[in-house]
């Protein structure tokens, strides 16, 4: 790395420390040319995949929209605001670490539904009614029966 003081092209790493809370590495560097020390912070550049809607349009993932949809689905259910926030955080984390460039909206809905079914079946049913494409009421009933039967592993 180039020294910020003298622009010497080669600096030495004196010390490296992992910063768990930020998923980063802090490095202390030393310039052999001018003798000055400086620090760097290295983080991985993770990109959020774009969401591909049913109309094949790409749009950025919107955590607030997911939070609003979960809040609407959780009305009159036992799902707490903290559980909603945790579901949003978990979904964001899974998307970041998936390594995918794009994710279909149906796959995103399934990802959220798996977590919701584990927490609150009533909220999951409301969310599914809004976000899964059912051709007819029988398909919805079939999905619901499978979700209840597998205990949230639908």
Swiss-Prot record:
One of its GO terms (biological process) is negative regulation of DNA-templated transcription. Its cofactor is Zn(2+). Transmembrane segments: none annotated. Residues 49-139 form the ATP-cone domain. Keywords: ATP-binding, DNA-binding, Metal-binding, Nucleotide-binding, Repressor, Transcription, Transcription regulation, Zinc, Zinc-finger. A zinc finger (unnamed) spans 3-34. InterPro entries: ATP-cone_dom (IPR005144), NrdR-like_N (IPR055173), RNR_NrdR-like (IPR003796). GO terms for molecular function: ATP binding; double-stranded DNA binding; zinc ion binding. Negatively regulates transcription of bacterial ribonucleotide reductase nrd genes and operons by binding to NrdR-boxes. Belongs to the NrdR family. This is Transcriptional repressor NrdR.
């Amino acid at each position: 790395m180039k020294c910020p003081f003298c622009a010497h092209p080669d600096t030495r790493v004196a010390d490296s420390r992992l910063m768990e809370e930020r998923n980063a590495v802090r490095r202390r560097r030393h310039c052999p040319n001018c003798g000055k020390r400086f620090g760097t912070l290295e983080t991985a550049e993770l990109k959020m995949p774009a969401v591909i809607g049913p109309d094949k349009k790409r749009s950025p993932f919107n955590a607030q929209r997911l939070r609003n949809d979960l809040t609407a689905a959780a009305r009159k259910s036992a799902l707490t605001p903290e559980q909603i926030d945790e579901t949003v955080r978990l979904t964001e984390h899974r998307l970041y670490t998936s390594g995918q460039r794009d994710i279909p909206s149906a796959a995103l809905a399934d990802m959220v539904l798996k977590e919701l079914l584990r927490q609150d079946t009533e909220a999951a049913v409301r969310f599914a009614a809004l976000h899964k494409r059912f051709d007819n009421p029988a398909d919805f009933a079939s999905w619901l029966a499978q979700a209840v039967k597998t205990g949230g592993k639908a």
